[in-house]
Amino acid sequence: MGAKEATVRGPGASPVHRTCHLIPLLLAGMLTTGLAQSPVPTSAPRGFWALSENLTVVEGSTVKLWCGVRAPGSVVQWAKDGLLLGPNPKIPGFPRYSLEGDSAKGEFHLLIEACDLSDDAEYECQVGRSELGPELVSPSVILSILVSPKVLQLTPEAGSTVTWVAGQEYVVTCVSGDAKPAPDIIFIQGGRTVEDVSSSVNEGSEEKLFFTEAEARVTPQSSDNGQLLVCEGSNPALATPIKASFTMNILFPPGPPVIDWPGLNEGHVRAGENLELPCIARGGNPPATLQWLKNGKPVSIAWGTEHAQAVAHSVLVMTVRPEDHGARLSCQSYNSVSAETQERSITLQVTFPPSAVTILGSTSQSENKNVTLCCLTKSSRPRVLLRWWLGGRQLLPTDETVMDGLHGGHISMSNLTLLVKREDNGLSLTCEAFSDAFSKETFKKSLTLNVKYPAQKLWIEGPPEGQSIRTGTRVRLVCLAIGGNPEPSLTWLKDSRPVNDPRQSQEPRRVQLGSVEKSGSTFSRELVLIIGPPDNLAKFSCKAGQLSASTQLVVQFPPTNLTILANSSALRPGDALNLTCVSISSNPPVNLSLDKEGERLDDVAAKPQSAPFKGSAASRSVFLRVSSRDHGHRVTCRAHSEALRETVSSFYRLNVLYPPEFLGEQVRAVTVVEQGQALLPVSVSANPAPEAFNWTFRGYRLSPAGGPRHRILSGGALQLWNVTRADDGFYQLHCQNSEGTAEALLKLDVHYAPTIRALKDPTEVNVGGSVDIVCTVDANPILPEMFSWERLGEDEEELNLDDMEKMSKGSTGRLRIRQAKLSQAGAYQCIVDNGVAPAARGLVRLVVRFAPQVDHPTPLTKVAAAGDSTSSATLHCRARGVPNIDFTWTKNGVPLDLQDPRYTEHKYHQGVVHSSLLTIANVSAAQDYALFKCTATNALGSDHTNIQLVSISRPDPPLGLKVVSVSPHSVGLEWKPGFDGGLPQRFQIRYEALESPGFLYMDVLPAQATTFTLTGLKPSTRYRIWLLASNALGDSGLTDKGIQVSITTPGLDQAPEDTDQPLPTEQPPGPPRLPLLPVLFAVGGLLLLSNASCVGGLLWRRRLRRLAEEISEKTEAGSEEDRIRNEYEESQWTGDRDTRSSTVSTAEVDPHYYSMRDFSPQLPPTLEEVSYRQAFTGIEDEDMAFPGHLYDEVERVYGPPGVWGPLYDEVQMDPYDLRWPEVKYEDPRGIYDQVAADMDAGEPGSLPFELRGHLV
C-alpha cells in the first residue's frame, strides 16, 4: 500500500481508493462509514517496519491503525491517550477494539469498528523489552472522528408557509445540530443566495462537538411569492448538505382596475337599456377586492377571482333610468396591503323620452260652451313638440311653452280653447308629442269629449194609489226616463230621503234597488220592496235631474210589538201582580185577550197610547196573586186582527222567588250492589237555584269537593262508587238558597253477597239422636229461599238429603237430622245465594258418635314367636268408634301389667279408626304362650277380641284355592296364605293329568305370591292340582298333601274361560277299611318309633333352639332396618315407652297367624295414613314411632268387601293436601263487622288463614 493512500470500505460496496490529502478537515475521500486504513510512512522509525500516520474518518466507519514490529518476539500493545490497552488481541473493556495481523511477522494492527467520538484520541504502539530488542514507543498517531449535523432548526418553522409583505425586512434564524467540525450555513431565497448573513460557532452538548447559529436578513419581493427560502448546512462528514426550508407567501397590492366597455369615453346610453360594465384588476396577493360605486355610493360588491392568472373581475349590471343621467360609475380595487384604493370611472350621458303626456282640464261641458285644456309632457332629453287632434281633425293650440325638466331634460306645454256642440259628444280629443330623436316612437294622450244635455220625460209604474197591501207583500216600482246626457241617474226617495240598497245581506232583503238600465234612449230603474209597517202611507219619489215623479202605498199589518208590562219584577208567594198588555201599532186595529197557562183571565181596558207607522194602538190589564207553583208559568197576551185573520201573541214568564221545595217524584230509597255505583238523585224546586247541596251521613258531612269514592254533581245528586256495606244507611240532604232551606232523607240499601259468619264444625250427635247443623250468614237482602244444603261423598259427590229437614229463619239456616245413622256422617255444604254473586259456601262435618267396634275375626287370631326369651312379638288390636277409644289388655283373663318392662303399648288414633299395638319382649313359652284379650272402650260402650300367642311351627295349609282363568295350555290360580308358623313360607304346586299317571311339581315364584299361572298344560285334559305351603320346619298338610282342585282344560277350538268363582275343591276320597296285615305292620312300626323317640326328641330340641336364635337375630336386624328406612312422620301415636313395635290386626273370617321373622304389618291406605291435624280437632297428639310401612301390609288380614261393611262414611281427602276445599265455604269465625271497603280485594290465598273460611 502506498504511503499517501487510505482504503475506505463501505457496507456492501467494493473498496474505493482516493488520494489522501493531509490538510485537516478536508479529507473528503474519508467521509464514508467503511474501513479506513492509515497510510504507512515510507520511512518507519527504528524498530518498526510499518506505522500509520494521522487519520480522519467519519463517525461509524471502521479504521485500522498499522503497527509493524521488527522484533516479533516482543510484547506489543497500544496506548490510547496514554492508557495502555494490553497485549490481548481481544482488548478487555473495549469490545470494538481488537489486534489484527500475524504476530510472528511482527503485525500488531489496531482495528476499531464503528468509530464514534470517544475514539477521537492519540494512539501509540509500544513494544516491550525483550532479548531481541529494547523497549520501543512509536510516534503518536492522531485519529480524528468527523460527526455530521443531524438536524437544522429553522425559524420560522421549516415546512410551514410564512406570510410576508413585499418590501419589508424580516429576520430568519437557522441553527445546526451538534457536529465536528462546526457546519457551514448558507441561505437561498428563490434560488438566490442571501448575502446579509451573520454566523456564530458555539460549543455543542458534548466535548469536541460544535453547532453553528446563522441569522439572515431578508427583504422579499412580489416575485418571491410561492418560492422557498432554504437553509443549507454542510461539513466534511456530509456527502451532501442538509437542508430546511419554508414557503414564502408574499403579500403585495394588485394592479389598477380596467373597465372594458366600448363607449367608455363618450358614456352615451339610452334609458331602459340593460348596461353591463366589466372591471378587471390583475395581480396582487391576496387577489384584488373589487366594488362598484355610483356617485360615490357602493352599488355592487360581488367579484370573482381566477387564482391561476391572479385576476379579479366584477361586472356591473344595471338598467339605465333617466335619473342616471350624469351619474359617475367607478370601479375600485384594493387588497389588505394596498396603500390606497385604485379607481377607474365613467360618466353616463342618458337619452330618454317623456314618460307621460297629460291633458289638464275637464272634457265635460254643456253644449254651446267653451272647454279650456292644457297638454303637458314629462321631462325628456332632448325636448319634444306637441299637436292637438279632435277625431281626425287637427286643432290649433292657443299657445306653447318649453321648460327645464328633471335629469337635465325639458318639459313641453300646449294650451287649447274649444267651443263644444251636441254633435261633438263622444269624440276623442288627443294631444300628441313627437321628436326626431324618437322617430320610431309616438307619445300621446286622448280624452273623450262629453257634451251635456237634459232628459225629455220621467214617470213611475207600480200599484195604483190607495190600494191596501198586506205587510210582507213584494211590491215592484219602476222609474222610467227618455233621453239626456249624461244618462239620467234616476234616484229613488222615500219621504224625501234617498233609498239605498242595504249593504248587509238580509233573508229576504226588504229593499232591492236595481241599477239604471238603458234600452235605446229609454232609461229605467227598479225598486223592489217587501212591504212592512214603516211603508204605510209613505211617499216614494223618483228624480232625474230637475224632473220628479211620486206614488203612495197603504199597508195592512198586525201589531208591530206586543208587550206585557209588570208593576214588579221580584215576586214572592202571596204577592199581588198587575200585568198590562200593550199593542204598539197595527193597521187595522186589533182585539186583545190574556190567559195563564191556557186559563182565560179577566182583564180591563187601559188608556191607549199614540201609535207609530200611522197605525192604531191598544192595551188591556189583569190582576194576579202569585204562589210558588206559579214560578215559570207564562201569562200570554193575544192580539187578533179580523181583517188580516192573524193573531200575534206575547208572554210574560212569572219569576217567583221561594225557598227549596222537594218535588213529589223525589226518590227516597236507592238500591245498589256492593262494589257498584250508586246515584242518589235530587228532585228539588227553588228560585233562585239552590246555592249549595250539603250531604251528611251518620252525622258526618260529605265534602262538596268530592272524595275518593263520592262526588256531588252539579244538580245536587250524590254519586258513589265502589260502594261497600258500610255505606248502607240514611243520607240527609240540606238545600239552601237566599229564600230559605229544605231537608230530605234518602236511604241507600247496599246489597252484598252472603258471608257465612257461624257454622259449627264439627257437629256431633250420638247414633239415633237428633241434631241441627246451623249456618248463620251476613247478607243483604235476606231471602226466605236463599239457603240450600248438599251432602258430599267421595270426590265431593252430592248425595241425597231426602231424610233430612231444611229450614231457615232470617239470616240463619238449619239442616235438621233426626235419628242419626252412621251412614249420615260426613261432610255437608251450606250454600247461601241471595242473588248477589258469589254464593257463600261452607263445609261442616257431621260426626256420629258410636260405641267401639273391634275387628275380631273368628275363630281366633294367632301370632307366632320363639319362646326361648330371645325374640319379641307384637299384637295388633284395631277398633272403630267415636269419641276416641281407650284400650286395655288381659292375658288368660288377668289384666296385663303394662308397667312390666317386657310390655310396650303404642296407641294410634286416626279419625274413627283406633289401634293399640302391644309388644312383648323376650317371649317365654312358659309365660307368654297364652290367650290375650284386647278391650276397646269409649263413653258409649266397649268391645273386645282375642289373640293367641303360639310357638313357631310348620305352616298351615293355604286357604281358598280357586281357579280364576283357564286356557287350553294354562290355568290361573289364586289362594290365601295360611298361618306361616312364624317362619318364611313358600308355595309349591303339584298336579297330574288323570289320563297319564305321575305327578309334576312347580315352585311358585316369587315366594310370597298368592296368584300363579300354571303353564304347559294339554288341551281338553282333566287335571288335578294340589297347593302346598312349606317353611324351614316342614310342609303343610303332610297327611292330605294340601288342598286341591280339579279342572278340565278347554279344547283349542274353545274360547279361554275367565272366572272369579272358585271351583269345587275335591277332597281325597276317604280311606277304605284297613285290612289286618297292614294294621299289624303299623303297630310294629310304632314300637320301633317309641325306641327312637328319646334320640329324636333330643335332636329336635337342639334344632328348635338353633332356629329360634336365627329368627331372633334376623327379626332384630329387620326391625332396625325397617325403622331406619320407613319412619312414619305424620302418624299420631300414644306410647308408654320409646320402643319400636309392630302391629297385628285381625279382620279375616279365617284364622291368621303371624311370625316374628321380618314381620312388618301395615294398615291399608285409608284415612289413618295421613295426619288430620289440619282437618280435625280433638285428636290426641301422641308420640309414636314404628316402621313406616307397618300398615300397608295388614290390609290382607281384613275381611273382603261385604264381610264387615262400612262402619263409618268417611270424607275422602287428598292425601297430599289435608285441607278442606278452600272455595266451598266461609269461615264461621270471621270478623262480623267488616265491610267490603275494609277487605283486601286480592286473591283468597292472600288472606290470613283464619279469614280464608277454611274449616280447621
UniProtKB/Swiss-Prot annotation:
Post-translational modification: Phosphorylated at Tyr-1208 by FYN, leading to the recruitment and activation of phospholipase C-gamma-1/PLCG1. Tyrosine phosphorylation is reduced by high glucose levels. Dephosphorylated by tensin TNS2 which leads to reduced binding of NPHN1 to PIK3R1.
Side Extracellular, residues: 36-1078
Residues carrying Phosphoserine: 446, 1112, 1119
InterPro entries per record: CD80_C2-set, Cell_adhesion_signaling, FN3_dom, FN3_sf, Ig-like_dom, Ig-like_dom_sf, Ig-like_fold, Ig_I-set
Region listing for Disordered, in residue ranges: 491-516, 1048-1071, 1112-1143
CDD domains recorded: FN3
Subcellular location: Cell membrane
Span of domain Ig-like C2-type: 39-144, 149-247, 256-347, 354-448, 454-554, 558-649, 754-846, 852-953
Observed phenotype of the null mutant: Death by postnatal day 2 associated with proteinuria, edema and massive glomerular vascular leak. Kidneys display enlarged Bowman's spaces, dilated tubuli, effacement of podocyte foot processes and an absence of the glomerular epithelial slit diaphragm. Impaired skeletal muscle development characterized by incomplete myoblast fusion.
The Fibronectin type-III domain, residue ranges: 957-1051
GO cellular component: cell periphery; cell projection; focal adhesion; membrane; plasma membrane; slit diaphragm
Chain positions found as Phosphothreonine: 1115
One example of a Gene Ontology biological process annotation: myoblast fusion
Membrane-spanning intervals of the chain: 1079-1099
Coiled coil: none
Glycosylation sites: 54, 370, 415, 561, 578, 591, 722
Modification sites for Phosphotyrosine: 1208
Expression sites (tissue/organ): Expressed in kidney glomeruli. In the embryo, expressed in the mesonephric kidney at 11 dpc with strong expression in cranial tubules with podocyte-like structures. Expression is observed in the podocytes of the developing kidney from 13 dpc. High expression is also detected in the developing cerebellum, hindbrain, spinal cord, retina and hypothalamus. Expressed in skeletal muscle during myoblast fusion such as in the adult following acute injury and in the embryo but not detected in uninjured adult skeletal muscle.
Main location: membrane
Protein's membrane topology: Single-pass type I membrane protein
Assembly mode: Interacts with NPHS2 and with CD2AP (via C-terminal domain). Interacts with MAGI1 (via PDZ 2 and 3 domains) forming a tripartite complex with IGSF5/JAM4. Forms a complex with ACTN4, CASK, IQGAP1, MAGI2, SPTAN1 and SPTBN1. Interacts with DDN; the interaction is direct. Self-associates (via the Ig-like domains). Also interacts (via the Ig-like domains) with KIRREL1 and KIRREL2; the interaction with KIRREL1 is dependent on KIRREL1 glycosylation. Interacts with KIRREL3. Interacts with phosphatidylinositol 3-kinase regulatory subunit PIK3R1; the interaction is reduced by high glucose levels.
Protein name per Swiss-Prot or TrEMBL: Nephrin
Species in which this protein is naturally found: Mus musculus (Mouse)
Primary gene name: Nphs1
